[in-house]
């Protein structure tokens, strides 16, 4: 397997896609990851348009191929398990649409985060438990893993249907933030997940 050097175009969010790709190519990069929702806007990927038009998808992929570059991943980092009504459902929908778009574009990797639920069904905010030394925190984790297993089982099925892979970043403030927690999610849900990065971005 050949190592591909690339970049996440969020670092050039203030440039149009073509200009951003020219900057990356000028720095010797050939692999590209673009944002499709979650925490930040997606200026380099108009998801609704691409989902609705085969011609738009062909033109979009042509932006990369005409420069000798490859779109290797869609990024929808967010918290799909967030109990806040204006956050979790939107991020979850962004993830579903990203998977559907990846299938339509022939992209294999969806870069994402596991998300973090609240501590209980009535929680208003996410709760990140790192070191559960007390029984109440074990109860919190049991609830959170139940929530995660249901959501990620759905996502696993959607990923399989679209022949894509969920590449989960093990990131702080997420239920999956270490190799141990990643393995737990895979054991609960299924094998169409991987860990593309072992460190957080800076």
Residue ranges of each PLM-predicted region?
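Boundary/entry segment of secreted carbohydrate-active catalytic domains
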Residues: 1-15
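Residues at the starts of beta-strands that form the adenosine-phosphate
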Residues: 4, 31, 70, 165
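Glycine-rich, proline-tolerant flexible connector loops at the mouths of alpha/beta enzymes
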Residues: 34-61, 114-122
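Residues at alpha-helix boundaries and short interhelical turns
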Residues: 11, 54, 68, 82-85
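Active-site acidic/histidine proton-transfer and metal-coordination neighborhood
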Residues: 19, 59, 63-66, 73, ...
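Catalytic domains of carbohydrate-active enzymes, especially glycoside hydrolases
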Residues: 18-40, 105-109
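Glycine-/proline-rich flexible loop or hinge segments
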Residues: 41-47, 75-83
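Active-site beta-loop-alpha junctions enriched in small/polar residues
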Residues: 8-12, 35-39, 76-79, 115-117, ...
């Amino acid at each position: 397997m050949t190592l591909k050097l690339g970049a996440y175009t969020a670092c050039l969010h203030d440039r149009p896609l073509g200009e951003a790709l020219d900057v990356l190519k000028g720095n010797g990069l050939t692999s590209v990851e673009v944002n499709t929702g979650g925490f930040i806007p997606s200026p380099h990927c108009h998801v609704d348009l691409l989902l609705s038009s085969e011609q738009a998808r062909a033109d979009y992929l042509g932006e990369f191929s005409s420069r000798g570059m490859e779109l290797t991943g869609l990024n929808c980092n967010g918290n799909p398990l967030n109990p806040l009504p204006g956050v979790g459902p939107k991020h979850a929908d962004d993830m579903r649409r990203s998977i559907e778009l990846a299938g339509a574009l022939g992209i294999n990797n969806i870069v994402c985060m596991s998300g973090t639920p609240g501590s209980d069904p009535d929680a208003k905010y996410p709760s990140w438990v790192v070191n559960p030394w007390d029984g109440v925190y074990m109860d919190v984790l049991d609830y959170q893993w139940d929530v995660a297993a249901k959501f990620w089982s759905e996502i696993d099925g959607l990923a399989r249907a679209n022949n894509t892979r969920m590449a989960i970043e093990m990131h702080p403030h997420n239920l999956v933030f270490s190799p141990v927690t990643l393995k737990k999610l895979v054991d609960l849900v299924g094998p169409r997940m991987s860990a593309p990065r072992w460190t957080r971005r800076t």
